């Protein structure tokens, strides 16, 4: 289910985030060797953490957010989160007509736009494949005609089959709420609610 925000519920403007922190978690063991080198060994897959703080909410805004979070906990679903700072809409067009060759893996992906896309992504933009929930960041971009070469972090979690389509806009992080067992707020003497924050972890 989608975490409510002003895009989904414009009648509740307070659901816009006061601050949001996207954290790159890349679990790794580092060992300092006698020759001065540092050996790195990955111990788990990379995942994104998201920390969200809300401004003071009016009672109807708080009640709506609280009910959505309780519904998430009741159903055991995922929370899909959109981060507005990444909604640049630099790439537009018909992504359904884009082809992604099969057999690709690693940290780069090649796609053929077939002339259906306008604009170009930039380093730091988000990227996703239509068939898998993992979110990537673009680290480099180059093109030759209709062929785009996109460098990604982290490495692709899947090997492409040729059925995937690229996603550049409206990218949702699929997450689990990590502080749901102690979620709370403070009712102020002016009738607003404060101290509301969410700690989320990408979950595939």
Curated annotation (Swiss-Prot):
Forms the simplified baseplate, together with the p132 collar protein, the baseplate tube protein p140 and baseplate hub protein pb3. The keyword Cytoplasm does not apply. Homohexamer. Interacts with baseplate tube protein p140 and baseplate hub protein pb3. Keywords: Late protein, Viral tail protein, Virion. Pfam families: DTP-pb9_A-dom_C, DTP-pb9_A-dom_N, DTP-pb9_B-dom. It comes from the Viruses. This is Distal tail protein pb9.
